[in-house]
Amino acid sequence: METDLNSQDRKDLDKFIKFFALKTVQVIVQARLGEKICTRSSSSPTGSDWFNLAIKDIPEVTHEAKKALAGQLPAVGRSMCVEISLKTSEGDSMELEIWCLEMNEKCDKEIKVSYAVYNRLSLLLKSLLAITRVTPAYRLSRKQGHEYVILYRIYFGDVQLNGLGEGFQTVRVGTVGTPVGTITLSCAYRINLAFMSTRHFERTPPIMGIIIDHFVDRPYPSSSPMHPCNYRTAGEDTGVACPSVEDSQEVCATSFSTSPPSQLMVPGKEGGVPLGPSQPAHAAQADQERLATYTPSDGAHCAATPSSSEDAETVSNSSEGRASPHDVLETIFVRKVGAFVNKPINQVTLTSLDIPFAMFAPKNLELEDADPMVNPPDSPETTSPLQGSLHSDGSSGGSSGHTQDDFVMIDFKPAFSKDDILPMDLGTFYREFQNPPQLSSLSLDIGAQSMAEDLDSLPEKLAAHEKNVREFDAFVETLQ
């Protein structure tokens, strides 16, 4: 398509579309991992991440997305699709949803590539983060395990909606206008999941042949394999590592820098692995799928949320006698204790919470009951205007005890006040204005009396003004 873009704007636009497609795949797949993702923001962004979002990339997902794109970009007539499906342990599968990134011919030639397109793609990616967690597949992904797993497949071409069955619904995430076309991101998802309980899943032909090593050339190059989002069989070895994110993607080196910070790298067995809640593992499987996440099914479990019944700061591992496959992740959930810090007391009483830093005090807890700082002595009862206003004359003797229980009177002693300076004492001023007197203007009798007095004195005031009328005229002449 012929446009008026210069070479630099065209290069930036292609780069934005490329990395938006890669980040779209990351967001969709990470939303189907079955775990909550928590990322930390940073006040010092760099150019290693994109679209003002700290999305930690899974290297294998990025690798598969680049293989599916094969150097192409979503354009008019070329769509990138991410298919999410479900597969049981018996081999039955069912498509759940299909995410489509496409472009139409409607152009916006007035928009600026370097700022407007980039910021709108960032907003579209944030919308995708929210919408991926409201479709039915998200709830299924949170319950995946030994009975079924969630798979993903990336392909480039026409959208295939036949596997969604009848009555599927579509939702449009959003659109972004560019000088070469309008980018559209949409989703079609299955809503009829009632037949899942009867295990009557739709049979689909194998997408690829059975491969022992998935790095060998596939017998069907035109097909794309399915990848479990969050599953690993027992006894698998993670001997093959994917290229790291830093090696597989470029740095945002445009004329501006509004990208989130770079990822922290932790040395692993065979190279740097990005530290994050979605740690991938790469392994070969005996059927047509390959593995893409970190959660093993041999009992190893990583606590994801503090609301779980287990301790949210430790990693529970049921396998004994061997190292955990995600030892790197333990640094995220284990509380780090600094040097020269005593172990906190497990049982902390309520009285110890009244004093700041009570757990570091050298005294014993049993002496706190006699401490006047913890349990101050009872102050004598005092009478104040506020207390008198609270106990009205109409209150009966039976309700006076209940009122005293509800209102606790405290003798107000302001700081830095002196008793000998009564007119300037802040406490006296405060007590006087707690119960201010009624305004005289609000009383009808007093108002009527004052008005009558004013009317009686009116003739005298008029006579005084008539007597001094010459003085008033002379004063007016001096003003002229």
Swiss-Prot record:
Location of the motif LIR: 407-410
Protein name per Swiss-Prot or TrEMBL: Autophagy-related protein 13
Free-text comment on this protein's domains from its UniProt entry: The LIR motif (LC3-interacting region) is required for the interaction with the ATG8 family proteins GABARAP, GABARAPL, GABARAPL2, and MAP1LC3A.
Residues modified as N-acetylmethionine: M1
Superkingdom of this protein's organism: Eukaryota
PANTHER family: AUTOPHAGY-RELATED PROTEIN 13 (PTHR13430:SF4), PTHR13430
Subcellular location: Cytoplasm, Cytosol; Preautophagosomal structure
This protein's UniProt keywords: Acetylation, Autophagy, Cytoplasm, Phosphoprotein
Function field: Autophagy factor required for autophagosome formation and mitophagy. Target of the TOR kinase signaling pathway that regulates autophagy through the control of the phosphorylation status of ATG13 and ULK1, and the regulation of the ATG13-ULK1-RB1CC1 complex. Through its regulation of ULK1 activity, plays a role in the regulation of the kinase activity of mTORC1 and cell proliferation.
GO CC list: Atg1/ULK1 kinase complex; autophagosome; cytosol; phagophore assembly site
PTM annotation: Phosphorylated by ULK1, ULK2 and mTOR. Phosphorylation status depends on nutrient-rich conditions; dephosphorylated during starvation or following treatment with rapamycin. ULK1-mediated phosphorylation of ATG13 at Ser-318 is required for efficient clearance of depolarized mitochondria.
Compositionally biased tracts (Polar residues): 305-321
Chain segments carrying region Disordered: 254-323, 368-403
Coarse class of the protein's main subcellular location: cytoplasm
Subunit details: Part of a complex consisting of ATG13, ULK1 and RB1CC1. Interacts with ATG101. Interacts with ULK1 (via C-terminus). Interacts with ULK2 (via C-terminus). Interacts (via the LIR motif) with GABARAP, GABARAPL, GABARAPL2. Interacts (via the LIR motif) with MAP1LC3A, MAP1LC3B and MAP1LC3C. Interacts with TAB2 and TAB3. Interacts with C9orf72.
GO biological process, one term: autophagosome assembly
Annotated stretches, region: Important for interaction with ATG101: 127-134
Modification sites for Phosphoserine: S318, S319, S324
The keyword Cytoplasm is assigned to this record: yes
Any one GO molecular function term: protein kinase regulator activity
